[in-house]
Swiss-Prot record:
It comes from Haemophilus influenzae (strain ATCC 51907 / DSM 11121 / KW20 / Rd). It holds the Pfam family UPF0149. This is UPF0149 protein HI_0817. Belongs to the UPF0149 family. One of its GO terms (cellular component) is cytosol. NCBIfam families: PRK01736.1, ygfB_yecA. InterPro entries: YgfB-like, YgfB-like_sf. It comes from the Bacteria.
Length: 182
């Protein structure tokens, strides 16, 4: 069974890891959406989240399971089951911060997997620009929480779509296609 967001957060914090669960999910998602297919994801994770030090043994398994679960949901393009690993907190301001954290680490991950990402044009280039804007998502504590929640829901769906766009673009031939029934 996949570890819960809060349990993963606690384990990362206890181990002194520089990422929270949301950032970890964003980073791993970025690597996968960027087309990384080998085992280099683990050394990259250690490098960018733990000063090149391996994670404690007890943390490697849940992180690997998370990586595999993200990979599986991304490959199911038709099912669109991929979800952003955002905080479970119901507070809309906390969720907005979580989305910004996820997007920041997603861009880092995809940038590592696709070093020429900044040169992409068209849909991909626009999506990169949009994600950079989302990373700087701002709000005022006086903002109407209901309106912010609605806007945030739309942005989250858009980011899910962007992730799937990147995955489809950089992982051609890897996408699971279901047979067409006649």
């Amino acid at each position: 069974m996949l570890i819960s967001h809060s349990d993963l957060n606690q384990q990362l914090k206890s181990a002194g890891i520089g990422f929270n669960a949301t950032e970890l999910h964003g980073f791993l998602s970025g690597l996968l959406c960027g087309g990384l297919k080998d085992q280099s994801w683990l050394p990259l994770l250690y490098q960018f989240s733990n000063d090149n030090h391996a994670y404690p043994t007890g943390l490697v398994q849940p992180v690997t399971e998370l990586y595999e679960q993200i990979s599986q949901t991304l490959s199911d393009v038709e099912g669109f089951t991929f979800e952003l690993g955002l905080t479970e907190d119901e507070n809309v301001f906390t969720q907005a911060d979580s989305l910004s954290d996820w997007a920041n680490q997603f861009l880092l991950g995809i940038g590592l997997a696709q070093p020429e990402l900044a040169k992409e044009k068209g849909e991909i280039g626009e999506a990169v620009d949009d994600l950079q804007d989302i990373c700087q998502l701002g709000y005022d504590e006086d903002d109407n929480e209901e309106e912010l929640a609605e806007a945030l829901e739309e942005i989250i769906e858009y980011v899910r779509t962007i992730a799937m766009l990147f995955y489809s673009h950089f992982n051609e031939g890897e996408i699971e296609s279901k047979p067409v029934l006649h």
